[in-house]
Amino acid sequence: MINKIKILFSFLALLLSFTSYAKAEDLHDKSELTDLALANAYGQYNHPFIKENIKSDEISGEKDLIFRNQGDSGNDLRVKFATADLAQKFKNKNVDIYGASFYYKCEKISENISECLYGGTTLNSEKLAQERVIGANVWVDGIQKETELIRTNKKNVTLQELDIKIRKILSDKYKIYYKDSEISKGLIEFDMKTPRDYSFDIYDLKGENDYEIDKIYEDNKTLKSDDISHIDVNLYTKKKV
């Protein structure tokens, strides 16, 4: 078993050992963000909402799926989608939710406190027989660092879940949302086996409030986990920008 693990890690290291081509000048700088934006980004990516195997038959405003008493501490949970079709897709289905949640400007459903979340929803029945390990290649100023690993047991996983997991690692290890940390720019790229790839500029936040930061996930973009090749992360320090 140990030998198999060593072979897996060696293969990942070989697979991910190509050169980074991301350009720092094309990315947003952390110095552009307010203290509030950095604090909210830290909170959103370090403390995700996670719930499995819950069901709702209630839709509000056509696009919001309502889970009574299923939020943290028994709050009502409002899951917001970009379209009514997405809300209908998950109505009356057992679902898993993994995402960044917020309270400010979350519309109340009842007398309970309401907790909101954009997307982050997958069907509970669609699980892998064996956990999938995805390698994340990290460069700082073009110098390759230790490969990070994220895991999922889902056949179809939201881009939000993967993004949160890798940003949590980067937050812990490189302090990306600390104002005084040396990292000033960054790009996360999800490299697929299919023609299309996906990327996030770490400091391209769409506002300083949590409900603004999280809105990029309302499309509930979902990837087949078997189609994900690996993740590339390019970080840049102030001295290199």
Swiss-Prot record:
- Superkingdom, natural source: Bacteria
Record's signal peptide: 1-24
Compartment(s) where it occurs, according to its Swiss-Prot or TrEMBL record: Secreted
List residues binding Zn(2+).
Answer: 191, 230, 232
- Could you give the cofactor binding note from the entry? Binds 1 zinc ion per subunit. The zinc ion is necessary for interaction with host MHC class II molecules.
Co-factor(s):
Zn(2+)
Give the family, as the similarity comment puts it: Belongs to the staphylococcal/streptococcal toxin family.
Q: What is this protein called?
A: Enterotoxin type H
Native source species: Staphylococcus aureus
Instruction: State the taxonomy lineage.
Output: Bacteria, Bacillati, Bacillota, Bacilli, Bacillales
Q: Point out the gene that encodes the protein.
A: entH
